Amino acid sequence: LGDVYKRQIKDMQLAAKRIAVFWAPNMSLGANLINLLSKLTTTKLGKDFDIDITDLHHKHKKDTPSGTAKFIQEEIHDSLNKIKVKKKVNISAFRSGDSTGEHSIIFSGEGERVIIKHISSSRNIFANGAVRVAAWLHKKSPGFYNMSDFLKI
């Protein structure tokens, strides 16, 4: 399942008692990897660095910011809470041209910046990710799985 807004999490958790259920806001492996890298980077730099997210998609995309950007923001806030840091993580969303999707997480400190970025150039990556996850999930016991489980991180 790739429901961006977590609307049906409770139903999915109930189903996971009987079958293997997978949830991710984005089925791109690269987009999920930058999320995991951002969480790690937040635990190391979050205390001293400002954190911002950029979200670029085609001009016809309806949601602003995207579900992926909101999910990354939420995960970064969770990582900040773990290191007991309270700060705002801004999202700057742009809808322009025909971009399939581009997300950057920018950690800005004194005299340096760390930028974690993912650019999708084809919508095929979402289908390819879903197919790979489905093949993996097929072998799993009942439970509620996410991209961290799939990527083994």
Explain the meaning of each model-derived region.
Residues 47-153:
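C-terminal substrate-binding/catalytic lobe of Rossmann-fold NAD(P)-dependent oxidoreductases
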Residues 13, 27, 38, 124-127, ...:
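Hydrophobic alpha-helical segments
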Residues 1-5:
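Short, small-residue-biased leader/transition segments that mark boundaries at the very start
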